[in-house]
């Protein structure tokens, strides 16, 4: 025995009961009684008609099983060693007090500045040494000699 379901109310339709409505696009609707057929034809929303199965389902009426809450995974940051720094070194640097960290940063900046100054002085000295060894600069044009103008000849 095949039991159909009412397209509007969701009620069971036993064999020999109910009516069939075929829409223009060949979609079939089954109704258990004229009440649900009438409401369907009035274009009523079954979720808003209090006695329908859809209404009860939509408004969580009747018996419902407790659905276990969906657990979401929480991301936890894991500290790993990177190239050039071991895990111990990273942890040690992180645990430094801000004052100590600032002092270290200032010392490093000062040392870098001094190194840069020394490099610049060394480069300047090297340049001066090269200039002294080369002597006075002579341009290529001067080395070749000035352009000689050819004297015009006439007949």
From Swiss-Prot:
One of its GO terms (molecular function) is structural constituent of ribosome. GO terms for cellular component: cytosolic large ribosomal subunit. InterPro entries: L24e/L24_sf, Ribosomal_eL24, Ribosomal_eL24-rel_N, Ribosomal_eL24_CS. Residues 98-155 are annotated as: Disordered. This is Large ribosomal subunit protein eL24. Keywords: Ribonucleoprotein, Ribosomal protein. Signal peptide: none annotated. Pfam families: Ribosomal_L24e. GO terms for biological process: cytoplasmic translation. Disulfide bonds: none annotated. Residues 98-129 have a biased composition (Basic and acidic residues). CDD domains: Ribosomal_L24e_L24. The keyword Metal-binding does not apply. It comes from the Eukaryota. Belongs to the eukaryotic ribosomal protein eL24 family.
């Amino acid at each position: 025995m095949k039991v159909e379901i009412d397209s509007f109310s969701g009620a069971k339709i036993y064999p020999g009961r109910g009516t069939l409505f075929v829409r223009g696009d060949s979609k079939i609707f089954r109704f258990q009684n004229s009440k649900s057929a009438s409401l369907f034809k009035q274009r009523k929303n079954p979720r808003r008609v209090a006695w329908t199965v859809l209404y009860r389902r939509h408004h969580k009426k009747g018996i419902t099983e407790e659905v276990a809450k969906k657990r979401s995974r929480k991301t936890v940051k894991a500290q790993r060693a990177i190239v050039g720094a071991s895990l111990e070194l990273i942890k040690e640097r992180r645990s430094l007090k801000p004052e100590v960290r600032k002092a270290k940063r200032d010392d490093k900046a000062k040392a870098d500045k001094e190194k840069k100054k020394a490099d610049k002085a060394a480069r300047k000295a090297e340049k001066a040494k090269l200039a002294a060894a080369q002597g006075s600069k002579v341009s290529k044009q001067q080395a070749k000699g000035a352009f000689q103008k050819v004297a015009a000849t006439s007949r």
